[in-house]
Amino acid sequence: MSDTILRTSATAVPDTALLDQSLLGATAGDWLALLKPRVLYLVVYTGAAGLLVAPGGINPILGFTAILCIAMAAGAAGAINMWYDRDIDAVMRRTAGRPIPTGRISPDGALAYGVALSALSVLLMWLATNLLAAGLLAASIGFYVFIYTMWLKRRTPQNIVIGGAAGAFPPVIGWAAATGHVGLLPVLLFAIIFFWTPPHFWALSLFASADYQKAGVPMLPVVAGQKATRLAVMRYTLWLVPLSLLPYVLHLAGPVYGASAMVLGLAFVWYSWRVLRDRQDGNGVSLTRDAPAKAAFKFSILYLFLIFGALVLDHLV
């Protein structure tokens, strides 16, 4: 791992001139990019699902505010992540075009933006819904920033496994915003996202391993190799499928969800099997330019959209 990268300071003394320059020179698109909008879609979607399936319902305006707070919090955490990871983002092809490495936004501007949005999202959630939802929202930000970004990401190949908890909070927060408590169903939804995260990100890391290695990030393919990563993708997918059926088995969801979870789960297993059986050279490197891994990565996103959509549909019918 590059000593230069690891020694790069993530806590530089604020430069007022740079901060002013970033505030004046950056476009709205640059500030939006700091929020990682591609990630926000799934966060908002799963948070809304948790809110919609919660018993009792919620005032539409308060519900919209709760989802907005979840989106703001996720975006804020993403901005702080980009601030802290600006050194490795600069050397990875996939992230080199982000606003901080390109100089469109200063590190201090990004940090101030992320902290302000974090505080605003938690305060607004508290005022609009309840203290539990606000506390869970704050915990999700803290987990992503301090546990995943600052502690795990550069230290262990299990960064995605443990850090996946940060992305699993939204349906729990949505449920808590509507009810003021946490039940068994949102806990199961948390677990589904938690076990979905490793095969999703490890599929990505299989075809982006050179980037991670260059940046010194110990993703599983970099540390354990391609073969071990392919096996891990399959293993977590096999754990995910029976777990995803528990809401139906425990009578927390109906047949629409149960049938959807089974079909989608079998499809996910098939995509993971293709990753496992991808043609490789003697070092486990794909001979197909990681086509199965790319397909599995794309399907994993569709999987989460569809299974949570089935849950909401089941609740409505």
From Swiss-Prot:
Location of this chain's protein in the cell: Cell inner membrane
Top enzyme class: transferase
Keyword Cell membrane: yes
Covalent S-S links between cysteines: none
Matches recorded under Pfam families: UbiA
Source domain of life: Bacteria
One term under GO cellular component: plasma membrane
EC number: 2.5.1.141
Membrane topology designation: Multi-pass membrane protein
Associated pathway: Porphyrin-containing compound metabolism; heme O biosynthesis; heme O from protoheme: step 1/1
GO terms of biological process kind: heme O biosynthetic process
Catalytic activity field: heme b + (2E,6E)-farnesyl diphosphate + H2O = Fe(II)-heme o + diphosphate
Main location: membrane
Alphabetically ordered keywords of this record: Cell inner membrane, Cell membrane, Heme biosynthesis, Membrane, Transferase, Transmembrane, Transmembrane helix
InterPro entries: Protohaem_IX_farnesylTrfase, UbiA_prenyltransferase, UbiA_prenylTrfase_CS, UbiA_sf
PANTHER family listed in its UniProt record: 4-HYDROXYBENZOATE SOLANESYLTRANSFERASE, PROTOHEME IX FARNESYLTRANSFERASE, MITOCHONDRIAL
Record function comment: Converts heme B (protoheme IX) to heme O by substitution of the vinyl group on carbon 2 of heme B porphyrin ring with a hydroxyethyl farnesyl side group.
Remaining remarks: Carbon 2 of the heme B porphyrin ring is defined according to the Fischer nomenclature.
Protein name from the UniProt record: Protoheme IX farnesyltransferase
